[in-house]
């Protein structure tokens, strides 16, 4: 995962100081891309320990079309707690947009189901896109989508995925996002009887919060360890039928966790 460390270093060297919605302040660069060959290992950051349980359960929660944190709480995941209302609701965030995007005529569109079917029936399509950036519902969301849009691509019987992340909390958020979308790529590939190729991460406003700079510098002193591999233990009937127990990260070694405050 030297690629990720290079992004940390790039921001520390070239970032400009900016104000932000949370009032914390950031060092920021605009426009950055990282590529991960999924055949060479699963891209879990090894220079600090990641909570893989949160990564897997959050993705399963998105895939359920759920926007209430009760499922996450039941499974020991707290990463959305700060944004939920008193009933645990977040408004029409990722899961709602992925699975039931509302149309002007009162229908809803299951973007993910449609894309999986398109990959199977028309793998050369250039329209294999899922968007969470629903302009008409942004003001109802507890947090507007940071990872806003992703696109699949099939070549040589292998599946790639590219994510566009308009706002990237590089120390806390991006390691989760890389792992989450890499996991999704593996799952979609399995459902479509494809091998995996690349996960490509493209960031817009890529930033380190000013109260994360010391933590980023600590991480840069650590030598990356070999990447783990992902085992998917069964192939369920659909993309939406996976369970937490279906996934195992084999030989995940990491340096200790590094604590950092969340900017709300």
Swiss-Prot record:
Reaction catalysis annotation: dUMP + (6R)-5,10-methylene-5,6,7,8-tetrahydrofolate = 7,8-dihydrofolate + dTMP
GO molecular function annotation: thymidylate synthase activity
Pathway as given in its UniProt record: Pyrimidine metabolism; dTTP biosynthesis
Chain segments annotated as transmembrane: none
PROSITE patterns for this protein: THYMIDYLATE_SYNTHASE
Keywords associated with the record: Cytoplasm, Methyltransferase, Nucleotide biosynthesis, Transferase
One biological process term in Gene Ontology: dTMP biosynthetic process
Domain of life: Bacteria
Classification via InterPro entries: Thymidate_synth/dCMP_Mease (IPR045097), Thymidate_synth/dCMP_Mease_dom (IPR023451), Thymidate_synth/dCMP_Mease_sf (IPR036926), Thymidylate_synthase (IPR000398), Thymidylate_synthase_AS (IPR020940)
GO cellular component: cytosol
Localisation per UniProt entry: Cytoplasm
Positions of disulphide bridges: none
Residues reported in the UniProt entry to bind dUMP: 21, 126-127, 166-169, 177, 207-209
CDD domains: TS_Pyrimidine_HMase
Residues noted as binding (6R)-5,10-methylene-5,6,7,8-tetrahydrofolate in the record, renumbered to the chain: 51, 169, 263
Top EC class, one word: transferase
Principal cellular location given in the protein's record: cytoplasm
Pfam families xrefs: Thymidylat_synt
Catalytic residue positions: 146
Gene3D superfamilies in alphabetical order: Thymidylate synthase/dCMP hydroxymethylase domain
PANTHER family tied to this protein: THYMIDYLATE SYNTHASE, THYMIDYLATE SYNTHASE 1
Family, per entry: Belongs to the thymidylate synthase family. Bacterial-type ThyA subfamily.
Function per UniProt: Catalyzes the reductive methylation of 2'-deoxyuridine-5'-monophosphate (dUMP) to 2'-deoxythymidine-5'-monophosphate (dTMP) while utilizing 5,10-methylenetetrahydrofolate (mTHF) as the methyl donor and reductant in the reaction, yielding dihydrofolate (DHF) as a by-product. This enzymatic reaction provides an intracellular de novo source of dTMP, an essential precursor for DNA biosynthesis.
Quaternary structure, from the entry: Homodimer.
Name of this chain's protein: Thymidylate synthase
Organism: Legionella pneumophila subsp. pneumophila (strain Philadelphia 1 / ATCC 33152 / DSM 7513)
Upper classification of the organism: Bacteria, Pseudomonadati, Pseudomonadota, Gammaproteobacteria, Legionellales
């Amino acid at each position: 995962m030297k690629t990720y460390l290079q992004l940390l270093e790039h921001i520390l060297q070239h970032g400009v100081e900016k104000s932000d919605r949370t009032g914390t302040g950031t060092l920021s660069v605009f426009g950055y891309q990282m590529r991960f060959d999924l055949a060479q290992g699963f891209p879990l950051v090894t220079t600090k320990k990641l909570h893989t349980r949160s990564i897997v359960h959050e993705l399963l929660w998105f895939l359920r079309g759920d926007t209430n944190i009760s499922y996450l709480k039941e499974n020991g995941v707290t990463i959305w707690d700060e944004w939920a209302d008193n009933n645990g609701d977040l408004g029409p965030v990722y899961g709602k947009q992925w699975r039931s995007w509302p149309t002007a005529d009162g229908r809803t569109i299951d973007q993910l189901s449609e894309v999986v079917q398109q990959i199977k029936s028309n793998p050369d399509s250039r329209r294999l896109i899922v968007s969470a950036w629903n302009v008409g519902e942004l003001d109802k969301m507890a947090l507007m989508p940071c990872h806003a849009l992703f696109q699949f691509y099939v070549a040589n019987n292998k599946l790639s995925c590219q994510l566009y992340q308009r706002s990237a909390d590089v120390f806390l958020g991006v390691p989760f996002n890389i792992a989450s979308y890499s996991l999704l790529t593996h799952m979609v590939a399995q459902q479509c009887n494809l091998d995996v190729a690349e996960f490509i991460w493209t960031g817009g406003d890529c930033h380190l919060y000013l109260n994360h700079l010391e933590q980023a510098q600590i991480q840069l002193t650590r030598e990356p360890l070999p990447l783990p591999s992902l085992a998917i233990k069964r192939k369920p009937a659909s993309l939406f039928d996976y369970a937490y127990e279906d996934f195992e990260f084999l030989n995940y070694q990491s340096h200790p966790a590094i604590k950092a405050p969340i900017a709300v």
